[in-house]
């Protein structure tokens, strides 16, 4: 299944409703991006939940430690999905997955910065993650990285939904 997700990364907080409101009929998933959460706190997840009660809400926590704690924080704020960095230790990932499973939520493991994305995606599947994220970071994009380069290899390697982020636009599609 293909879903369209919009990430709110950098936006004045007072423009959230006027920016997201017109998008609600056109997107399936609303994401509180990492910079947005860092700027304004997890309250932005609550606001996205209020704006799009029927939408899937993602908190891009990029957890690197304390997976269970961060998962609980994201889910308490109204997220359906939270992210953990794939380079985090297995215990961190397992903690987030355990909380997500207990609460009927999901975890995406973001492969940003992982050298062997296919091998790690296979390991993550074994840890029970619900989705893997193929994410080409802004800094890598500036150096000319192709945001879709790893996609085919990863989708062929794991039987998990794959989320694609970073550098996806009309030119790259």
Across the structure, where does each feature detected by a protein language model lie?
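Structural detector of well-ordered beta-strand residues that form the stable sheet scaffold
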Residues: 5, 31, 57-58, 108, ...
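Active-site beta-loop-alpha junctions enriched in small/polar residues
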Residues: 7-11, 33-37, 62-66, 87, ...
């Amino acid at each position: 299944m293909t879903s369209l997700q919009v990430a709110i990364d950098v936006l004045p907080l007072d423009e959230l409703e006027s920016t997201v409101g017109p998008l609600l009929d056109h997107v399936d998933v609303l994401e509180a991006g990492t910079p947005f959460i860092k700027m304004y706190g997890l309250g932005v997840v609550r606001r996205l939940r209020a704006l799009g009660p029927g939408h899937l809400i993602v908190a891009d926590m990029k957890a690197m430690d304390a997976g269970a704690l961060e998962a609980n924080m994201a889910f308490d704020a109204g997220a359906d999905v939270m992210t953990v960095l794939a380079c985090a230790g297995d215990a961190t990932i397992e903690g987030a997955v355990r909380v997500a499973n207990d609460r009927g939520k999901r975890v995406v493991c973001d492969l940003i910065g992982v050298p062997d994305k296919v091998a790690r995606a296979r390991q993550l599947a074994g840890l029970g993650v619900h989705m893997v994220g193929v994410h080409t970071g802004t800094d890598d994009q500036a150096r000319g990285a192709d945001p879709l380069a790893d996609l085919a290899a990863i989708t062929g390697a794991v039987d998990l939904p794959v989320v694609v982020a970073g550098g996806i636009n009309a030119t790259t599609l």
